[in-house]
A protein has these predicted regions:
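Phosphate-binding site recognition
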Residues: 1-154
Length: 154
């Protein structure tokens, strides 16, 4: 696997409080990109949690902001931790849900990925975002020519 430039940018952004967003079409490598910094953090002994809205047993934790934060606190404690959420577009009103969680100023860093209507989430938080596109080199070395990923900071 090509080590993506986005991986370096994502690692550089991990110390920042803002959410990190990764989005693009299906099968573009979003989950693989998210797993790279998680592995990096796990190897450093950091607290991490990976939730996937495609997985049935992860979904109940997204029924309310309180349930979501309780799950995170049970897994990571009340200290700094990293929460990876894959397929966030499956959450109804994901933008409002996440904005509310972010506004609570919890000690957790959120790294999110999604596709499709996930672009609507980006538009909801766009005033606080910056985009970094997948490099042309990486696009040229993909098996599927039309793949792209966007990485945004909220």
């Amino acid at each position: 696997m090509i080590k993506r430039k986005l991986f370096s940018e994502l690692i550089d952004h991990l110390p920042q409080k803002e959410m990190s967003l990764i989005f693009g079409p299906r099968q573009a490598g979003k989950t693989a990109l998210m797993e790279m910094p998680k592995t990096h953090l796990d190897q450093r002994g950091e607290r991490t949690l990976f939730l996937n809205l495609d997985i049935e047993w992860d979904r109940p934790h997204f029924e309310s902001q309180a349930a979501f934060l309780k799950k995170i606190e049970l897994e990571l404690g009340r200290k700094r931790g990293y929460v990876f959420i894959d397929e966030i577009q499956r959450k109804d009103d994901a933008g409002l849900f996440l904005k509310g969680v972010f506004d609570l100023k919890s000690p957790y860093k959120f790294i999110l990925s999604g596709s499709g209507i996930f672009a609507q989430l980006y538009r909801q938080i766009q005033p606080r975002t910056m985009l970094c596109h997948q490099s042309q080199f990486e696009q040229n070395h993909q098996n599927r020519p039309n793949n792209y990923l966007l990485f945004a900071f909220s």
